Amino acid sequence: MNPNMPPRLCSQRGNALVEFALVLPLLLLIFAGIVDFGFLFQRYEVITNAAREGARIGVLPGYDEAAVQQRVLDYVQAGLSMSAGDAVAALTPPPDVDTVMLAAGTGAPFAATQVTVSFTYNYLIIGPIVNLVTGGDWTASITINSRSTMRREIVGS
């Protein structure tokens, strides 16, 4: 510090504010990323549970492919607050195909069918936050895929 400088120029007041102003955007971006990852994880859990719920319904007698798809879409709509047009659900194969004969523990044969429910969801990464700051139309997304397979067992078939 030069003793000939006026005290006003030698003051340290305001340094912390300037440093905070320089670091704040980075801290906000990190915080937004943490929040966005939380939303992504929540979406993944809903998609996974929806596929599992669809497979669970698919192995029950009396339910067809349309009922399974509707159950999955209802679960996703309730969990993600989205419209039916935003979701894509696929049931492969339908519950009444690909029958395989297995031996049950009692020795009686029974038919088993694999029911697989797949669900795909596109998640927009930090898009609303980036669009708010830039005023642009940024649309980077992650595709979340979930698949659940359960076995339908029909004793005595």
Protein language model annotation of sequence segments:
Residues 2-3, 56-157:
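Short, conserved structural patches
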Residues 2-76:
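Alpha-helical assembly-interface signal, strongest on the long, hydrophobic N-terminal helix that forms
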